[in-house]
UniProtKB/Swiss-Prot annotation:
SUPFAM superfamilies: ARM repeat (SSF48371). Cytoplasmic protein involved in the delivery of the dynein machinery to the motile cilium. It is required for the assembly of the axonemal dynein inner and outer arms, two structures attached to the peripheral outer doublet A microtubule of the axoneme, that play a crucial role in cilium motility. It is linked to Ciliary dyskinesia, primary, 18: A disorder characterized by abnormalities of motile cilia. Respiratory infections leading to chronic inflammation and bronchiectasis are recurrent, due to defects in the respiratory cilia; reduced fertility is often observed in male patients due to abnormalities of sperm tails. Half of the patients exhibit randomization of left-right body asymmetry and situs inversus, due to dysfunction of monocilia at the embryonic node. Primary ciliary dyskinesia associated with situs inversus is referred to as Kartagener syndrome. Expressed in nasal epithelium and lung epithelium by ciliated cells (at protein level). It is found in: Cytoplasm; Dynein axonemal particle. The keyword Acetylation applies. It comes from Homo sapiens (Human). HEAT repeats lie at residues 71-109, 202-240, 241-278, 280-318, 354-376, 377-414, 599-638, 696-734, 738-776, 784-822. Changing L795P: In CILD18; decreased protein abundance. This is Dynein axonemal assembly factor 5. InterPro entries: ARM-like (IPR011989), ARM-type_fold (IPR016024), DAAF5 (IPR052623), HEAT (IPR000357), HEAT_DAAF5 (IPR056497), HEAT_type_2 (IPR021133), TOG (IPR034085). GO terms for biological process: cilium movement; inner dynein arm assembly; outer dynein arm assembly.
Length: 855
């Protein structure tokens, strides 16, 4: 029956074809001998027939003429090959697809095959239920079928329009195929189909958007690229409303790890901005996508995006030339303060951004605070690009921009903060400082924050000097207010505050002289409150920079210039200070760092110290102040006594400051304060600032309190007290009242039993000085009983286990031997036999015999 059908087909040509040529008849007869094998029951038989057909079509011969091939192809081969697409044998189906490919390529009118080819392809690729697997089980064959569909699109072009339903049904399924190569080929086919049938495709293009958006996130990057490019063509030649459906997916691909994918997004979006029919209505949605690519990490992507964006701007500029006539004819030059290393966008690009900024900003500002890090980073990178285009037109959106920057500058991601500081710099560059300062400073006045200070610093850094200079004093005054500069002791806050001062100094240079006091006040606060050493060092460097722009040699010269007003402000509340008061910390910094200028400010400094160091004040505060006072007293000539005026305040220091704090009170804190006071007294007496007479005055006032401190638990206090007494005795010589002099040595003798050898050695040294004072006294006989008692006690210690102590005691005894040598000899001989070693006693006796008695 099959042979009969073939014979009838050969004998009765189609009426539309007319009489066949001899080549066609010959080909028909050749094929008629092979076609019956396609109906064989056995798989090998059908396969042999298909192989024979393949050889017949591939070999040169009658089939080489497309016109001669068209008739037999359409009547004999096509129907049977399409039936073979459902053959149970995979090999037969593969050969059938290959033969269909050959036939389409050789046929003179391949479009004639579409009415039968497209439904057959759709049946094999789609099936009746889209959710189920396609009828064609072999993925390589599905790939071949999609390639065949693509070939039909290439060969037939617009002739596919009547068969779009079948083609789209096949593509909707193949775009979701499990096999990556099928998806990729389907994307190419969809793009080609859209381009081939633009007049009809737009009515059904939306049906492909869903499958394409599922494919756009495929794990293979080449599939993702193909899906993006296919989406570009489908929307370009289809329904532009689908842009809304793909925007979020395209935005997500901007985060793709593969640069080729990001490049595809830039290319497609740029193409839409140039060629999409209703592109004007989508500008505000597409511009952010393309501009985001300007910050891509790969140079090639950045260059492509920049080139496309410039083309978009120039095209729009040309299309709206009449509207832009004035701006084109009278275009102002590039602003002189335009950011360096930035190329100014063409007018069309700037106008596009400006006109769409009100629609772009709300979504962008929302995304900058998104919970996803990548979204925040990308959005923050886009904002400075928009501001660079908007220039001074950003003024009308400034409130929204600044509010966003305040929030975004608190981000933990450094990249977000970096982009936001760049945005703030551009605000300073293009917006009048009168406008942005009003908004920023009012916000800081209500709620001071580290992020607000960072925005202010960045804006000032971007502002031209001549624009910022009139506002310099107002800014510095506001920063110096306690509600801002003392709002937080957090190092980040203080670092941002420092950035504000650095910005003013770096931008305004010598103009900072009008606000030098306020800026120094802020820097002083930063140094006082900073917890990190590095931050204090930076603040110190900024002080040096401020001094340089003011034309003075160092920050100490700055202090000399402003120390009066600084101390007047800081000490205004000194009666209310505690250990944690910012003013106390500021006062401490001024005293410690002002150097010689401190000597000019004693009328402020000493009364403040007197009031704050009373026993009724906060103990921790007193400890801090004593520490600072000790430090400056050690360098008194270069600090507190630089003008030689400190001795005139000596009575206040000794009677009103040191004496009350040397009094004994119970508790560890009180003991620590006594130690601090003793240290301060030691610094005072050893500073070489006081004359001998002044030291004697100090001795007269404080010796009783110092003697009591020899009993302190603190080894350091006992040691320093010994040294102070030694200094007092050396200065007074024999001028000390005998009664007072006699009261000293018993306290020193007690220290020879101290647990600390250092204290014992210091006590021994002081006893040497005491004996020298006795030598210098007029009535030595008055001291005989005291000296005799001293001899006895010293001879006990001469047998000490510690050799160093023995040596020290021997020196004391030698020093005192000249007073009453006979008495000393008797006392020595009385105990020599009790000593573990008579060596030291013998040395002492030899010394007494060799040295004459003191007259």
């Amino acid at each position: 029956m099959a042979a009969l059908g073939v014979a009838e087909a050969v004998a009765a040509p189609h009426p539309a074809e007319g009489a066949e040529t001899a080549e066609a008849v010959e080909l028909s007869r050749a094929l008629s001998r092979l076609l019956p094998g396609l109906e064989a029951d056995s798989k090998p038989g059908r396969r042999r027939a298909l192989e024979a057909l393949r050889r017949a079509l591939e070999e040169p011969g009658p089939a080489a003429d497309p016109t001669a091939f068209q008739g037999p192809w359409a009547r004999l081969l096509l129907p049977r090959l399409l039936r073979c697409l459902s053959d149970p044998a995979e090999g037969c189906r593969a050969l059938a697809v290959h033969l269909l490919d050959l036939g389409l390529r050789r046929a003179a009118r391949p479009r004639d095959a579409l009415p039968r080819l497209l439904p057959a392809l759709a049946a094999r690729l789609a099936g009746p239920v889209p959710a189920r697997r396609p009828p064609e089980a072999c993925e390589e064959l599905r790939l071949a079928l999609v390639q065949l569909l693509g070939l039909a699109v290439d060969l037939c072009g617009a002739a596919l329009a009547p068969h779009l339903d079948d083609a789209l049904r096949a593509l909707r399924c193949s775009l979701l195929d499990p096999f990556a190569a099928v998806r990729r080929e389907s994307c190419s086919c969809a793009a080609a189909l859209a381009q081939a049938t633009p007049d009809h495709f737009h009515m059904q293009s939306e049906s492909l958007i869903g499958p394409l958006m599922q494919t756009i996130s495929h794990q293979h990057w080449k599939v993702r690229v193909a899906a993006i490019e296919a989406t570009g063509a489908v929307i370009h030649f289809g329904n532009g409303k689908s842009v809304d459906d793909v925007l979020s997916h395209f935005a997500q691909r901007l985060f793709d790890d593969v640069p080729q994918v990001r490049r595809a997004v830039a290319s497609v979006v740029g193409g839409w901005l140039l060629c999409l029919r209703d592109r004007y209505s989508f500008f505000h949605k597409l511009i952010p996508l393309l501009l985001s690519s300007l910050n891509d990490e790969v140079p090639e992507v950045r260059q492509l995006a920049a080139s496309l964006w410039e083309d978009v701007g120039l095209q729009w500029q040309k299309e709206n030339e009449e509207d832009l006539k004035d701006k084109l004819d009278f275009a102002p030059p590039t602003p002189p303060h335009y950011p360096p290393h930035e190329r100014r966008p063409v007018l069309g690009c700037r106008e596009l951004v400006f006109r769409n900024l009100s629609k772009i900003l709300p979504a962008l500002c929302h995304d900058i605070t998104d919970w996803v890090v990548g979204t925040r980073v990308k959005s923050a990178q886009l904002l400075p690009v928009l501001l660079l285009h908007a220039e001074d037109h950003a003024t009308q959106h400034l409130e929204v921009v600044l509010r966003t920057l305040f929030q975004a500058c608190t981000d933990e991601e450094a990249a977000v903060v970096q982009s936001c500081t760049r945005s703030a710099e551009l605000v300073g560059t293009f917006v009048s400082p009168e406008v942005f300062l009003k908004l920023i400073l009012s916000t800081l006045k209500k709620t001071p924050s580290a992020s607000g200070l960072l925005v202010l610093a960045s804006a000032m850094r971007g502002c031209p000097r001549e624009a910022l200079q009139p506002h310099l004093a107002a800014i510095a005054t506001e920063l110096a207010q306690a509600h801002i500069c003392q709002a937080s002791e957090n190092d980040l806050y203080l670092e941002r505050l420092l950035l504000c001062v650095q910005a003013l100094v770096s931008v305004c240079h010598e103009d900072c002289g009008v606000a030098s006091l306020q800026l120094l006040d802020v820097l002083l606060t930063i140094v006082a409150l900073a917890g990190a050493t590095g931050l204090r060092d930076k603040a110190q460097e900024t002080m040096d920079s401020l001094a340089m722009v003011e034309g003075v040699s160092s920050c100490q010269d700055l202090y000399r210039k402003h120390i009066g007003p600084l101390l007047e402000r800081v000490t205004a509340s000194h009666l209310d200070w505690t250990a944690h008061s910012p003013e106390l910390l500021q006062f401490s910094v001024i005293v410690a760092q002002s150097g010689p200028a401190l000597g000019e400010a004693l009328p402020h400094v000493v009364p403040t110290l007197r009031a704050c160091l009373q026993p009724s004040q906060d103990p921790q505060m007193r400890l801090k102040l004593f520490s600072i006072l000790s430090t400056v007293l050690l360098r008194a000539t270069d600090t507190i006594n630089s003008q030689g005026q400190f001795p005139s305040y000596l009575e206040t220091v000794t009677k009103d400051i040191l004496a009350p704090n040397l009094q004994w009170h119970a508790g560890r804190t009180a003991a620590a304060i006594r130690t601090a006071a003793v240290s301060c007294l030691w610094a005072l007496t050893s500073s070489e600032v006081l004359s001998a007479e002044q030291i004697r005055d100090v001795q007269e006032t404080l010796m009783p309190q110092v003697l009591t401190t020899l009993e302190e638990d603190s080894k350091m206090t006992r040691l320093i007290s010994c040294r102070i007494i030694n200094t007092f005795l050396k200065t007074s010589g024999g001028m000390t009242d005998p009664e007072k002099l006699i009261r000293i040595y018993p306290e020193l003798l007690k220290r020879l039993d101290d647990v600390s050898n250092d204290v014992r050695m210091a006590a021994a040294s002081t006893l040497v000085t005491w004996l020298q004072c006795v030598k210098g006294a007029n009535a030595k006989s008055y001291y005989q009983s005291s000296v005799q008692y001293l001899y006895r006690e010293l001879l006990v210690h001469l047998d000490d286990p510690e050799r160093a102590i023995q040596d020290a005691i021997l020196e004391v005894l030698k020093e005192g031997s000249g007073l009453f040598p006979d008495l000393l000899v008797r006392e020595t001989e009385a105990v020599i036999h009790k000593h573990r070693s008579a060596t030291y006693c013998e040395q002492l006796l030899q010394h007494v015999q060799a040295v004459p008695a003191t007259q």
